[in-house]
From Swiss-Prot:
GO MF annotations in UniProt: ATP binding; UDP-N-acetylmuramate-L-alanine ligase activity
A GO cellular component annotation in the UniProt record: cytoplasm
Reactions mediated catalytically: UDP-N-acetyl-alpha-D-muramate + L-alanine + ATP = UDP-N-acetyl-alpha-D-muramoyl-L-alanine + ADP + phosphate + H(+)
Top-level enzyme category: ligase
The protein, known as: UDP-N-acetylmuramate--L-alanine ligase
Pathway(s) the chain acts in: Cell wall biogenesis; peptidoglycan biosynthesis
Function: Cell wall formation.
Family matches, as InterPro entries: Mur-like_cat_sf, Mur_ligase_C, Mur_ligase_C_dom_sf, Mur_ligase_cen, Mur_ligase_N, MurCDEF_pg_biosynth, UDP-N-AcMur_Ala_ligase_MurC
Organism: Bradyrhizobium diazoefficiens (strain JCM 10833 / BCRC 13528 / IAM 13628 / NBRC 14792 / USDA 110)
Gene name in the database record: murC
Length: 467
């Protein structure tokens, strides 16, 4: 049995969130009655209103009036008035992943998982399948620049979704094809141990049907180890590793992008097929790797080499993934979602490839628990930055932790040998500090999952106002 079309209003608590809004948008486009609320207004709410969803700002018990089912994310606390009202009225309450799973049952699916790179890789898979005429439905964890949205309803048989592992619910997703980009220590507030994280990814792949397949990056040692533990499922490996089935070869930075070749090796015959002269208009080895994963899936699903090459060359990217927000006196300002040490190091390495000038990193640590559990890694991931400006921790609802704050982080970076580390007293002072550090040809890279994106977009104008 599938989600009946005649079901009454589906209510989303936190409908403006990047994960929730995509599901809501696809449901609206499918003809379901959708309503919801969020704590504050934003771009996603406005987009959903225009599509016909009934959206409220603020959480109130009466918002769930008439709802047949209530959808919540893990960000919603048990004392939320709408969640409490739903339970008092015996309205079914489901997690975001459960509703996503219902949508996935309508199509054949590709699900992209991994600690980092999910959103970009999801966008790349969608772009390639679209170029191949497969017209996929897409539900992503970021705004796809080509769509102006994180979701779209396609007429084809395939759905491409980002599989969020943060609360373990990605194990509920019924996918036919899986990508695993990497597995690092993250979300330990939920999983408790890194071993539990690895077990979850192993189960994610083992949940595939016998006719499906997984595309896994063996450049990452943990993923390579997982490949060796998974039995009875078809695995296609990818990466720069010479043992990979789909190999990234001859990677050359080209200004703001990369040129490379992808080689496919047939395990049975040993024959090699190559797609040469691929041009990706995004810098960074990590983005070329993500593209290789997407290419592996696309070719497996019948997309031609010519369509792949054209789509990669025209790739429009994702909002908040190395996004240029403006310039000032030859200084370029970049906004990036990177908030884990591995992501930060990759972004700064991509920045280093993109300029001969200095790299000024502005970091807003996201969550006290993440900074605490990965403190050593955070203190060593800024090596490609010539200067680091450190803002206060963005709490994301967490309580402060003694000894885990901006000043201790600044001290940690200095203790690990970083020569230029500047604490940011307050956001309005950012432009003045940047003006003193950056000159023409330099890159200012704003990093974090909090409200630093607003600073990144305001910064060029603030710098111009200073002269």
């Amino acid at each position: 049995m599938r989600l009946p079309r005649e079901i009454g209003p589906i209510h989303f608590v936190g409908i403006g969130g990047i994960g929730m809004s995509g599901i809501a948008e696809v449901l609206v486009n499918l003809g379901y009655a959708v309503q919801g609320s969020d704590a504050s207004d934003n771009y996603n709410l406005d987009r959903l209103r225009k599509k016909g969803a009934k959206v409220s700002v603020g959480h109130k018990a009466e918002n769930v009036d008439g709802a047949e089912v209530v959808v919540v994310s893990t960000a919603i606390k048990r004392d939320n008035p709408e969640l409490m009202a739903a339970r008092e009225r015996r309205i079914p309450v489901v997690r975001r992943a459960e509703m996503l799973a219902e949508l996935m049952r309508l199509k054949s699916c590709v699900a992209i998982a991994g600690t980092h790179g999910k959103t970009t890789t999801t966008t790349m898979v969608a772009t390639l399948l679209d170029a191949g005429g497969l017209d996929p439905t897409v539900i992503n964890g970021g705004i796809i620049n080509a769509y102006g949205s994180n979701a779209r309803l396609g007429a084809g048989d395939w759905m491409v979704v980002e599989a969020d592992e943060s609360d373990g619910t990605f194990l509920k997703l019924p996918t036919d094809v899986a990508i695993v980009t990497n597995v690092d220590p993250e979300h330990l507030d939920h999983f408790k141990t890194f071993e539990a994280v690895q077990d979850a990814f192993r189960h994610f792949v083992e949940n595939l049907p016998f006719y499906g397949f997984a595309v896994m990056c063996i450049d990452h040692p943990v993923v390579q180890s997982l490949v060796g533990k998974i039995e009875d499922r078809r695995i296609i490996t990818y990466g720069e590793n010479p043992q990979a089935d789909v190999r990234l070869v001859d990677l050359t930075p080209m200004g703001g992008g990369s040129k490379f070749k992808v080689a496919f090796r047939d395990r049975k015959t040993g024959a090699v097929h190559e797609i040469p002269d691929l041009m990706l208009p995004m810098p960074g080895r990590h983005n070329a790797s993500n593209a290789t994963a997407a290419i592996a899936v696309a070719r497996e699903l019948g997309v031609s080499d010519e369509a792949i090459r054209s789509a990669i060359a025209g790739f429009g990217g994702v909002k908040r993934r190395f996004t240029k927000t403006g310039e000032w006196n030859g200084v370029t300002v970049i906004d990036d979602y990177g908030h884990h040490p591995v992501e930060i190091a990759a972004v700064l390495k991509a920045a280093r490839e993109s300029t001969n000038g200095k790299i000024v990193a502005v970091v807003q640590p996201h969550r006290y628990t993440r900074l605490q559990s990965l403190f050593e890694e955070f203190c060593t991931c800024f090596n490609d930055a010539d200067a680091v400006i450190v803002a206060d921790v963005y709490a994301a609802g967490e309580a402060p932790i003694d000894g885990i704050d901006r000043d201790h982080f600044v001290a940690g970076l200095r203790a690990h040998g970083h020569r230029e580390v500047v604490p940011l007293p307050a956001a309005p002072e950012l432009a003045g500090i940047v003006k003193g550090l950056a000159k023409s040809g330099d890159l200012v890279v704003c990093l974090g999952a909090g409200n630093i994106t607003q600073w990144a977009y305001a910064l060029p104008g603030e710098l111009n106002a200073l002269g």
